[in-house]
Every structure is written in structure tokens, then in C-alpha cells.
Amino acid sequence: STAYALNAPVLALIGQIPLGAIGKGFGLLHEIPDQLSILKSLTKKADRIENAESASKILTSAFSSLQSGRPRPVGVEVPVNIWNSQVEKFSDNLIGHPHQGPNVNTDRIEEAASILNSSKRPVIVVGGGAQNFSIEINNLSSSLSAPVIAFRNGDGIVDGSSQLSVTLPAGRELWGHCDVVLALVTRCQTAQMTWGVDDQMKIILVG
């Protein structure tokens, strides 16, 4: 549930009682009624490997889900008597296939760039979804001379020793004086709800 709430692309391999005993109510150790349904309610996608031959397809699908759309955990349930099964050939590529990203609205990008270029006191806020873009964010921060505020999931995107990396107490102070907020792969929900906004502040949400 934590991975789901934090948009973390986690692959969870879940143990299960022997395949033939699932749903029989034998009272086996670790037996949970309809465990797969519970798993589906906590993940972006969940499936069960019921034989060695289906492992390739199910795992490939799981990795595809991890790499596409909104980051969320994916679950794969494996009964205990399937773990040691062997298959002649594992045909699929677990890395998956490239996924097309969202359509880019160039007009909105140009508008955002114009706002940032004319800003006097810009601030960048980063979330966990921006972890793979550390180099780009550091370059952007330097070019704008914009301090970077990171909540827990965004820690480390900008090195803590950098002059442009600020702590939350300092970030709260800067928030009250900035004219533009560039929020990268974060809803910026906590800052807006607890630190407040005003009519003079422009917030650009990306991702």
C-alpha cells in the first residue's frame, strides 16, 4: 500500500499455498481467502503463475506494466509447488518493449518556458517521480538559479551539498516569496495545502 501511495514501480513476488489447494479452505499455513483479489486491490496489476509455461508471458506483462503509465506496484503470485518448475525456453524479453510516452503539447511547453524566463524568484519542487531525471533537473536549476525543494521521495535528485538544494524549513520560507513554482513529477499537494498559495504565484505542474 505504501508503494501504491508513493507511485513506486515495485515488483512484488508473492508466495502462495499449493495450486491445487487454493480456494479449498483446507486451513493450510499461510492460507488467505482469495489472496489474489487482495493483491489486485493493492497494486496496479496482479496475476498468478499457475505453470512454468505461463511464467514468461505473465512476467513480461508485469514488467511492461511497471514501465508504462503511472508508476505503481505490480504483483505476481506464485504457488509453492510451482517455484521449482522448469521450462524448456524462456522466450519473452523481460525488459519489455519501448512504450510511447504521453503526447507533448508544445504550446504549453513554450508558455511554461516563457513564464520561467521572465520569473524573478523561481523555485523548483521535485517528487519521487523525478528520480530518473537528476542530471536534467540539476542543469535546469543551475540555468534558472532556482533553489530546489524536495519532499521525502525527491531527496537526492539534487545533491544536499549543492547551494541550490534547500531543506524544507528553508523551502517554506522561499515558498512565501517566490513568483513561479515549477513542480516536477509531483502534485505539490503538501506545499499548497500547508504553505498556501496566492494570486501572485504561478504554479507549473509537469508530469
Language-model segment annotations:
Residues 1-207:
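N-terminal alpha/beta PP-like core and its mobile active-site loop of ThDP/TPP-dependent enzymes
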